[in-house]
Amino acid sequence: MIVSGEITVPARRNAVFEALQNAPFFASCVEGVHDLKEIDATHYDAVLETKVAYMKFTFKVSVEVTRIAPPDRIEAKIEGTPLSVVGRFTAVSNTDLVEAGDETLVRYSIDAAITGKLGSMGQPVLKSKAREMEKKFAERIRAAFESQHAPVAHTTPATPQAAP
């Protein structure tokens, strides 16, 4: 199942790229993610709780950042196992950042494979859930940048001008 889309973020590309690399910030934008643990600079574990149709699922999730091309692209591999039912999901995520004036277009594509009880629900149900999660993610990342709560990009301070 492939899910793709585009989100407009009200910030410059470097700032968005920096924020997306900040695992706690990224996790705070994904509804239902908690207990984030950094294994090393490119590996993370977390718990994801979500409801699909009438069923609630809790997943143990592992993320591996497989490629970073600053400030344009981030690729990751995601694997998850539901804690209460038999199944598994794997996904490869590709994210491209395109500068659009003072905003950034975040273009993403996720190729996911889902097995077990969750996989039996069918693509229309799962795509609907993915769109719902995308909407929440977009709301949260936009709100973080609009309220100045996103991680600040590392910049060199400007040299102060001498007073006249």
List the model feature ranges, each with a label:
Residues 12, 41, 70, 100-103:
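Short strand-connecting beta-turns/loops that link adjacent beta-strands
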Residues 115-160:
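A conserved amphipathic terminal alpha-helix motif
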Residues 62, 75-128:
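Beta-strand/loop substructures that line and gate deep hydrophobic ligand-binding cavities in soluble
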Residues 38-81:
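Glycine-rich portal/gate segments that line the openings of hydrophobic small-molecule binding cavities
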Residues 5, 57-61, 104:
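Short beta-strand segments
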Residues 1-51, 156-164:
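Hydrophobic ligand-binding cavity/cleft-lining segments
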Residues 16-20, 26, 65, 108, ...:
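Hydrophobic pocket/interface hotspot
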